[in-house]
A protein has these predicted regions:
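Short, Lys/Arg-enriched N-terminal segments with co-localized hydrophobic residues
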Residues: 2-10
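Active-site neighborhood of HAD-like aspartate-dependent phosphohydrolases
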Residues: 12-72
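Short, acidic loop-to-helix structural element flanking the phosphoryl-transfer center
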Residues: 24-34, 114-141, 148
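A metal-dependent, Asp-based hydrolase signature
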Residues: 77-115, 123, 131-134
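Acidic, Mg2+-coordinating phosphoryl-transfer loop and its flanking beta/alpha structural elements
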Residues: 201-231
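Substrate-recognition/cap helix-loop segment adjacent to the acidic, metal-dependent catalytic center
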Residues: 62-64, 88-93, 126-140, 144-174, ...
Length: 231
């Protein structure tokens, strides 16, 4: 994509975001939205890595006698590895995978993924994160990834942006996306961060990307705030 086309894309996207935000303010009678934190997914948002994940999942499941088409892997974006494995196992075999099977399958998939071409960071992602941080909004990561080198990889590609106590990974959650648990965990980590810095954490409005109506309601209920589904 040329720089000119990228600028046009950003302008169009910014116009859409402003219109959606204005409509939300009118609907709820608010004067403005004061963002305190922004939660970013990693694969497909910060890194252009979904094609590698899709290929690795497809080949891994075939190796273990199950079928997961590459296109379907995109539908499981954000899930924990165990969550994806159990969905396929239930469909293909009629039962969930054992803990030992999950460990073996995920290790095989991780090995294939690590052999794929290096996934570059998304165009303009670093510039966006710098702008977010400069505006006083706290950038966070909420990902289903269980990579042990996650923080090092983020710091190498996005220096001086993220910190470990403001990250939610597969190691922090039981259910994973699309369950609201990772976002709720992110809100709790943000509140703990604010308290550590000597501040107070007020109720939040959650802007949820691509979540279902029921997930939106769950986020709003458990957070004590509101949830604006972002589609």
């Amino acid at each position: 994509m040329s720089n000119g086309n990228r600028r046009l894309f950003i302008m169009i996207d910014e116009k859409f975001i402003r219109e959606a935000a204005d409509a939300y303010l009118r609907e709820h009678g608010y004067e403005s939205i004061k963002l305190k934190a922004a939660m970013f997914d990693m694969d497909g948002v910060l890194f252009d890595s979904m094609r590698n994940h899709a290929k690795s999942w497809h080949e891994t499941m075939a190796h273990f006698g199950m079928d997961l088409p590459e296109w379907e892997a995109y539908m499981h974006e954000g899930r924990t590895g165990a969550g994806t494995i159990n969905i396929v196992s239930m469909r293909e075999r009629g039962h969930e995978a054992t803990k030992e099977e999950i460990a073996d399958i995920y290790a095989y998939k991780s090995d294939l993924f690590n052999k794929c071409p290096k996934a570059e960071r998304m165009p303009w992602a670093y510039e966006l994160l710098q702008k977010v941080k400069a505006s006083g909004v706290v950038p966070m990561v909420v990902t289903g990834s269980g990579q042990k080198t996650l923080l090092e990889r983020l710091n190498r590609n996005f220096p001086d942006v993220f910190q470990q106590d403001l990250m939610v990974t597969a190691f922090d959650v039981k259910y994973g996306k699309p369950n609201p648990e990772p976002y709720l965990m992110g809100m709790e980590k943000y509140k703990a961060f604010v308290r550590k810095c000597g501040g107070t954490a007020a109720d939040a409005t959650v802007c949820a990307d691509g979540v279902s109506h029921h997930t939106s309601e769950a986020l709003a209920f458990h957070s004590g705030g509101e949830c604006a589904p972002w589609r």
